[in-house]
């Protein structure tokens, strides 16, 4: 009886440790992600798939959300704002239906938008303010992203220097469009009063 308990204990440890160690050698997906994709693709259905069906349909190994999150922390993987509960080592993100995309072998929501300090972006609100200030005559060559993503980007860029009130626009290559409403460029971000706070 004791040997049975020991075998069960070893199997439990292996079940939790092995997926974490092998996460970036194969593709995995969580139950929560499968549920979200199913709800998005068939909103009126209460379909739940068994583990073997998920593996067969997706080509990905089922893993718990806890193990995935622990593995991401241990491997120092960061990308977008929200991990989508799926890796993309060999197989593209199934959660792309939910707005997720692949970065550093992990599917993230907003992973393309988050490194915004590498390209020029502006929020709809900032663009609208600029348009109102100059009578609607402007050519926008910046990528439009949500205010929430822009704010999260400021937090995720640890090397970023704050100075003034962010005007919801970056100025990596293109000057601040929001200069029309009193903003200026500092550390790749347009700020109101950025010169006064230097």
From Swiss-Prot:
Among Pfam families, the record links this protein to: Cyclotide
**Swiss-Prot/TrEMBL keywords:** Disulfide bond, Knottin, Plant defense, Signal
Q: What is known of its domains?
A: The presence of a 'disulfide through disulfide knot' structurally defines this protein as a knottin.
Name-wise, this protein is: Cyclotides mra4/mra5
In this entry the propeptide is located at 23-79, 111-163, 194-198
Please describe what this protein does.
Probably participates in a plant defense mechanism.
Q: Which InterPro entries match?
A: Cyclotide (IPR005535), Cyclotide_bracelet_CS (IPR012323), Cyclotide_sf (IPR036146)
Q: How is it modified after translation?
A: These are cyclic peptides. The mature peptides contain 3 disulfide bonds each.
User: Which organism is this entry from?
Assistant: Melicytus ramiflorus
Q: Give me the disulphide-bonded residues.
A: 84-100, 88-102, 93-107, 167-183, 171-185, 176-190
- Name the PROSITE patterns on file: CYCLOTIDE, CYCLOTIDE_BRACELET
Task: Please give a single GO biological process term from the UniProt record.
Answer: defense response
| Signal peptide per UniProt | 1-22
Q: In which family does this protein belong, per the annotation?
A: Belongs to the cyclotide family. Bracelet subfamily.
């Amino acid at each position: 009886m004791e040997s049975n308990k020991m075998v069960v204990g070893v199997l439990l440890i292996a079940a939790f440790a092995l997926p974490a160690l092998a996460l970036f050698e194969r593709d995995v997906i969580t139950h929560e992600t499968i549920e979200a994709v199913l709800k998005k693709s068939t909103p009126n259905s209460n379909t739940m798939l068994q583990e073997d069906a998920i593996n067969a349909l997706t080509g990905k190994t089922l893993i718990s959300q806890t193990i995935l999150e622990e593995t991401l922390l241990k491997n120092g993987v960061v990308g977008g704002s929200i991990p989508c509960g799926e890796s993309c080592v060999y197989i593209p993100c199934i959660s792309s239906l939910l707005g997720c995309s692949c970065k550093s072998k992990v599917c993230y929501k907003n992973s393309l938008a988050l490194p915004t300090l590498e390209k020029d972006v502006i929020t709809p609100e900032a663009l609208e303010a600029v348009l109102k200030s100059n009578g609607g005559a402007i050519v926008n060559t910046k990528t439009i992203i949500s205010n929430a993503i822009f704010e999260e980007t400021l937090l995720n860029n640890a090397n970023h220097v704050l100075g003034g009130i962010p005007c919801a626009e970056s100025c990596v290559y293109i000057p601040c469009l929001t200069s029309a409403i009193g903003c200026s460029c500092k550390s790749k971000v347009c700020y109101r009063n950025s010169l006064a706070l230097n």
